[in-house]
Amino acid sequence: MEDNRIQNQIAIYMTNKKLCEFTDKLKPAPVEYYAHMHAQGEEQSAGFRAYSCIGVVLQDYSNGKGDKTVRVTANLSPGFFPFVLSRMQNDLDRFDFTEEKIFGDPDENGLSTVTKLSIKRASVGNDGKRRNYPWCIIVENGRAVKEKTPTGGTHIKSGTYKKQRSVYVNINDLDFFNIVYRTARFIESWELTFGPKLIRDARKLLDDQRAAAQQ
C-alpha cells in the first residue's frame, strides 16, 4: 500500500516557506574493499560504480506549492556530519564549506548535471548585528560541459555552466544542530548494521583464499 511506502528521510527542517531535508543514500563498499565500509566509487559486482552519501534536498514554496515549488538536490559525504558536529561543539563562530560536482552522462547538448553546495555560519551579519539564524545552506543545480583533468578526474569546463535552480535556507543553531546530530547518529547506526557483516564476509573470503593457496 502507498501509505506503507518506506521513506529515506533522516532529518528535516521546515518553515512555512522553506524546507531542508537530509536523506539516506548510504551504500556499502564491495567486499573486496570491506575496510572502506562506505562505497567510494569502487566497481561493484554488477559492473557499475556506487558512492555512499547523504542526500540534501532544499525546497522553496514561497511562491506556492506543486508546480510553483523550487526543488534542488545535492549530496554530502558521510564524513561531513561528524566533522561539522565536532566543530559545533567547540564554540563555533564561523564555518564555511563549499563544494561543486559534475557527473552523469552528457545530454544531447553535451551538458552534464552540476550541483553546487554551500554551508556557512556567520554569527554577525554585514550590519554588525547578531544573527538569529546564523546558518545558511545554499544548493544550486545546473548543467555544464564535463572536462577531464590531467590527473584523471573531471571538472566543469570554464564558461559552460548554466544555472537552472537555486534555493537557500537560513537555520538557527539549535535546529541545525538537531538535523546534523540526527544524521550523524543515523550514519553511526548504519555502520554498526552493515559493517560487521561486511567484515565477516571479507574475512571468510580471505581465509578461503589462503586455504586454497596452501593446497
Question: What is the predicted function of each stretch?
Answer:
Residues 45-50, 74-78, 129-130, 166-177:
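Short, low-complexity cationic-aromatic patches
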Residues 1-68:
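N-terminal "first-domain core" detector
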Residues 144-215:
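Mixed-charge, glycine-accented linear interaction segment located at domain edges/termini
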Residues 53, 73, 134:
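Beta-strand-rich binding-surface signature
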Residues 90, 105-164:
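Short, solvent-exposed interaction modules
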Residues 58-77, 154-169:
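A cross-kingdom feature marking solvent-exposed beta-strand/loop segments within repeated
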Residues 61-63, 81, 144:
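Conserved beta-strand elements of beta-rich interaction domains across eukaryotes
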Residues 79-112:
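Acidic, metal/cofactor-coordinating or nucleic-acid-engaging core segments within structured domains
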